[in-house]
Amino acid sequence: MKEFRGQDVLRNPFLNKGTGFTEEERKSLGLIGLLPNEVRTIEEQEVLVYEKVSTLENNLDKHLYLMDLYNKNRTLFYYTIGKHIKELLPIIYTPTIGDAVMNYSNNFDGPSGAVFLSVEHKDLIEEALKNGAKDLDEIKLIVVTDGEGVLGIGDWGVNGVSIVVGKLAVYTVAAGINPRNVLPVVIDAGTNNEKLLNDPFYLGEKHLRIYGEKYDEFIDEFVKVSNKLFPKVLLHFEDFGRSNARDILEKYRDKICTFNDDIQGTGVMMVSAMNAIARVTKKPIKDHKIVVFGGGTAGIGICDQILFEMENQGLSHEEALNRFYVIDRFGLITNDLENLTEGQKKYAKNRSDFPKDSSLEKLEDVIELVRPTTLIGTSGVFGAFSEKAVKLMAEFNESPAIMPISNPTSHSEATASDLIKWTDGKALVVTGSPSDPVKYNGVTYHIGQANNALLYPGLGLGIIVAKPSKVTDCMLSRAAHAIAELQDLDEIGASILPPVTLLRETSKLVGIAVCEEAILEGLNRENIENSKEAVLKEIYEAYY
């Protein structure tokens, strides 16, 4: 590796300590005269960083300040976030990351170590990845997006790079994935966002999105080159559009080590929540009847993961399918509707199974007809869970599970406080964005957040350690159970899922469980004698 000295050290975020360099380090690294004489510990630096963040009035400004630190001093960045994880995780990732994405081109202040690829230049993939990995250690994890399906805010093209940088930051904060072992990648395939196409400051290619054969060939080349340059790498696909996300996952999931957080991750978090809910209601997952409001990538992914769990509990494939009701913009998805995705077709109901005069367009009508035990929201439609719909859930169930998990808060189907109030405290609530505790009738209800950060960092940790040839549904199921088992549910008002303050503990448990499962399935490409020891040894700690 190249030996850095002087200004090169200060310009390298992995090496730079700012005022944290000791006198001996300043002499040996050629830093004499390049820094103020004061030497500060990382603890002293963190206090100053946090005080500065606290003075900033809005979350986007806080995000930009912290990302500036990320670009200058990676160690101090991770040390600071780790000290204030509950407060700062929503700043560096969801929900604030949505604002950062929308304002990325206007606030551009460097690439943050990301690799920028273009569908127009398939021949440059290898050169670009080599450049991005230069001066890093072994690349064990790549998070890649094409920016078409960013959170709940849609197509933001190359601005989606903020998502992959933020996602990898969460991997490090939560699971201790070494930042020198990861690579953020954004694929510029154009954009269908008219606002970006007409924005003179937009940094991406200003043409409509490329689809079809040209796009598919590019993805294929990217997958091949990534695995050639970085053998045993985990490829995490993030925020691809509905038309491509599932196709990519289905094409490659049995060929390489890959994971799609939007399809699989959200589903695993719902399995975790359902496992916890099963403990509270004394009703196993296989006995639940589920309405999913939102038939996109996340909604179908949730159905798939819970379906797998139901089959594990003894239901046949057909029996499990019959437990799901998926609602999209035209109402309940039935087999007489046109232009359904392959995922939607799988869960489409026979229209003839319902009375001819029955309305299947409104959520309330579907709830009244099928009487579900569980309602999950992935639509991104704010306020979609009406008071009438919620009260029907409470009428039909002693403890209805209601989970509006769309992000950010402005796109959530309902607020936790409304759900508790409308059900007279009966609802078991999980939300997508952080929710404050709700006080109702003398009880404080702690609201679980279906934060995928409880899953994917630990999953990645276990995968990086075991290096399996692929990521299986059984590994995801083991991860879901590990998350659910961490929470004490005996107290009234207890959160269904662990809080983000337990991210490190959760990630370790998930990592160990996934590593064990990889070995159990015989898919590990790394010889491991003790999963727990191997996982703990892999964890990076941010410190000078």
Where are the regions that the model predicts?
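Long hydrophobic segments that form regular secondary structure
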Residues: 359-425, 467
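Adenosine-phosphate binding glycine-rich loop
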Residues: 9, 15-16, 261-262, 281, ...
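Glycine-rich phosphate/diphosphate-binding loop of Rossmann-like nucleotide-binding domains
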Residues: 255-256, 260-374, 525
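Generic secondary-structure signature for well-ordered alpha-helical cores
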Residues: 27, 31-34, 55, 106-109, ...
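Short acidic, glycine/serine/threonine-rich loops at helix termini
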Residues: 128-130, 152-163, 194-201, 245-251, ...
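N-terminal ligand-binding/catalytic initiation module
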Residues: 1-257, 517, 544
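Flexible, glycine/charged-enriched surface loops at secondary-structure junctions
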Residues: 232-238, 284-288, 313-322, 488-498, ...
